[in-house]
Amino acid sequence: MDELSDEELAQFCQIANLAYRAGKPIISDQDYDFIYLDALKNRDPDNLLFKFIETEGQSFSEEKVLLPEAMLSIDKAYSWDEISKWIKRLEKSAMQISLDLSAIQIKATPKLDGFSGFDDGSRLYTRGDGKKGSDISRVFERGLCVFNDAERGLGAGEIVIKKSYFKKYLAHSFEYPRNFQASLIKEKALDEQAQKAIIDKAALFIPFIKLPTWSGLVAELVAKFDQIVAQVLVMVDFDVDGVVFEAINTDLKTQMGANRKFHRWQIAFKENKDKAHVKVLNVIPQVGRSGKITPVVELEPTLLSGATIMRATGHNYGLVKEQGLGVGSVVELTRSGLVIPKIIFVLKPMPVDIPDNCPSCDKPLVWKSDFLTCINHKNCPAQIIGKMAYFFKILANNDGFGIATIEKLYAHDIRSVSQIYALNIEDLVTIGFGEKTSMNLINQLNRSVSEQVEDWRFLAAFGMHRMGLGNCENLLKSHHLNDIFDLNLKEIANIDGFAELTGQIIVQGLISIADEFNHIYQYGFNLETTILTKDLQTLTHELFDKKIVFTGKMNHSRDDMKKHAKSIGIKVSTSISAKIDYLVIGDKVGQKKIKDAEKFGVVVMTETDYLSKI
């Protein structure tokens, strides 16, 4: 890891994550969590990996279907201090709804290390990106059973293999249980040992609501935390990589809600007690997309929590200067979350070497608060490359445009995303890509244009300062994408969640990207338009905020009906479950959908009935 730049580390984490979720891990789960991901978190806390649900690997079909309900990730804590802060957030929310703090109830369950899925009773989906996943219903058709012979349709859970069974019958053939779990899901026919594991009920789907639990009042959790963790970790004969804690009180969960990635009323605890005293060999400056210089600390190779650590982040040069983190320093090191190397404190300070010039463009650096910064934003190679790669990463509907590809394009005078979209196969071959690779890259560019993305994601991909995904969505809830470049400071500052300082930054940011935005926008991206808040507030129809499924042949285009439904505040799903409110039927409806609706108590209405209610 010591040879990796920030961008390369992020790319490696993405590759490792995809390989892990595809059932072909290239490093252990602990190494990923506590070495690489933690290093990335320390170097680049705003990286996309920490803001969005981790997607599964490309081993699954690229054809994705809408999940019956969103499957969020779980926030993680690696110490009692972080759990304590989570409890304080619970208590703060409880006070806001006048809930007695002594009445807060907590549930703890084992955090399974399997393949996440959602079972709606008729289909099984992978988690995918949390909104769309792959249909892997074939795994039930192959005979997979639900844990404890429970019924189908119990929602989110994981496909797992019993630890004792894996150790006895499968460890000689598979390096990790995930490799075997993946073989159950793949489209190819099952081999004999996989089929036997299913028959023996060693491989199972476990709905989370069927997991054994500890439950009690929050005061008991505080008093017996270590004991409860130890108890929960051994509750099941499956691979477990932590303990999930969640509030039980329904009104408290509603109050706390969720962000894009996880529910705030839930957290997963992972523990790492290993520490080491390590000598610093070097401190190397690296340039990020925004021009911030991150000090990368090279360390004497040290075995920690089963992995050899050779690198950690110094966060910023202000901290390096304050701590005396220089060549020859001795630091106390741990693996935060059992994955990422983290310097706890400097035991032996040494003189530090503060760089004067940017390591990428050699221009003088300036201090901005605790950060050394390269302000040569338009011409610094590292920043230009980082911004181009960032566009494709945020857009998230393409493959192939990682740092290595972008660096090669930069070496052949490509300096902007709009220049990339103007390339053809012949151009790429001339640059030095193979013909097949060139064809794939062009196909991915076309895919990024045709495959629908949210308009706020498209805007965020341009990488304006302070305009991440959340702020871009907030802006587009008040003004349409086509109108934002005409907004003045007052109009932006008046948006809820913004203020004058943020407004000034946004105005300048929009000016800086306007030309590039127009060049790229002309390619006709398939953008999903954000509904304006003022329009949502005028929606008073009976089906507002209800979940519906359309089925059968309609008088209107099914796609048009879905788009219209979403535009007026209706949540559209693709399959029947207990979470659905209405099934809207046209002609030639399959009886299975009708029976599923009856089974789950879903109200059935005709297309005419539906139109009359909106």
Swiss-Prot record:
<protein>
    <recommendedName>
        <fullName>DNA ligase</fullName>
        <ecNumber>6.5.1.2</ecNumber>
    </recommendedName>
</protein>
<dbReference type="InterPro" id="IPR004150">
    <property type="entry name" value="NAD_DNA_ligase_OB"/>
</dbReference>
<comment type="function">
    <text>DNA ligase that catalyzes the formation of phosphodiester linkages between 5'-phosphoryl and 3'-hydroxyl groups in double-stranded DNA using NAD as a coenzyme and as the energy source for the reaction. It is essential for DNA replication and repair of damaged DNA.</text>
</comment>
<feature type="binding site">
    <location>
        <position position="361"/>
    </location>
    <ligand>
        <name>Zn(2+)</name>
    </ligand>
</feature>
<keyword id="KW-0464">Manganese</keyword>
<feature type="binding site">
    <location>
        <begin position="73"/>
        <end position="74"/>
    </location>
    <ligand>
        <name>NAD(+)</name>
    </ligand>
</feature>
<dbReference type="InterPro" id="IPR013840">
    <property type="entry name" value="DNAligase_N"/>
</dbReference>
<dbReference type="GO" id="GO:0046872">
    <property type="term" value="F:metal ion binding"/>
</dbReference>
<dbReference type="Pfam" id="PF00533">
    <property type="entry name" value="BRCT"/>
</dbReference>
<feature type="binding site">
    <location>
        <position position="380"/>
    </location>
    <ligand>
        <name>Zn(2+)</name>
    </ligand>
</feature>
<dbReference type="InterPro" id="IPR010994">
    <property type="entry name" value="RuvA_2-like"/>
</dbReference>
<feature type="binding site">
    <location>
        <position position="158"/>
    </location>
    <ligand>
        <name>NAD(+)</name>
    </ligand>
</feature>
<keyword id="KW-0227">DNA damage</keyword>
<keyword id="KW-0436">Ligase</keyword>
<dbReference type="InterPro" id="IPR012340">
    <property type="entry name" value="NA-bd_OB-fold"/>
</dbReference>
<dbReference type="Pfam" id="PF03120">
    <property type="entry name" value="DNA_ligase_OB"/>
</dbReference>
<comment type="similarity">
    <text>Belongs to the NAD-dependent DNA ligase family. LigA subfamily.</text>
</comment>
<keyword id="KW-0234">DNA repair</keyword>
<dbReference type="InterPro" id="IPR013839">
    <property type="entry name" value="DNAligase_adenylation"/>
</dbReference>
<feature type="binding site">
    <location>
        <position position="374"/>
    </location>
    <ligand>
        <name>Zn(2+)</name>
    </ligand>
</feature>
<keyword id="KW-0862">Zinc</keyword>
<keyword id="KW-0460">Magnesium</keyword>
<feature type="binding site">
    <location>
        <position position="270"/>
    </location>
    <ligand>
        <name>NAD(+)</name>
    </ligand>
</feature>
<feature type="domain" description="BRCT">
    <location>
        <begin position="538"/>
        <end position="614"/>
    </location>
</feature>
<dbReference type="InterPro" id="IPR001357">
    <property type="entry name" value="BRCT_dom"/>
</dbReference>
<keyword id="KW-0520">NAD</keyword>
<dbReference type="GO" id="GO:0003911">
    <property type="term" value="F:DNA ligase (NAD+) activity"/>
</dbReference>
<dbReference type="InterPro" id="IPR036420">
    <property type="entry name" value="BRCT_dom_sf"/>
</dbReference>
<dbReference type="InterPro" id="IPR001679">
    <property type="entry name" value="DNA_ligase"/>
</dbReference>
<feature type="binding site">
    <location>
        <position position="358"/>
    </location>
    <ligand>
        <name>Zn(2+)</name>
    </ligand>
</feature>
<dbReference type="GO" id="GO:0006260">
    <property type="term" value="P:DNA replication"/>
</dbReference>
<feature type="binding site">
    <location>
        <begin position="29"/>
        <end position="33"/>
    </location>
    <ligand>
        <name>NAD(+)</name>
    </ligand>
</feature>
<keyword id="KW-0235">DNA replication</keyword>
<dbReference type="Pfam" id="PF01653">
    <property type="entry name" value="DNA_ligase_aden"/>
</dbReference>
<keyword id="KW-0479">Metal-binding</keyword>
<dbReference type="GO" id="GO:0006281">
    <property type="term" value="P:DNA repair"/>
</dbReference>
<feature type="binding site">
    <location>
        <position position="127"/>
    </location>
    <ligand>
        <name>NAD(+)</name>
    </ligand>
</feature>
<feature type="active site" description="N6-AMP-lysine intermediate">
    <location>
        <position position="111"/>
    </location>
</feature>
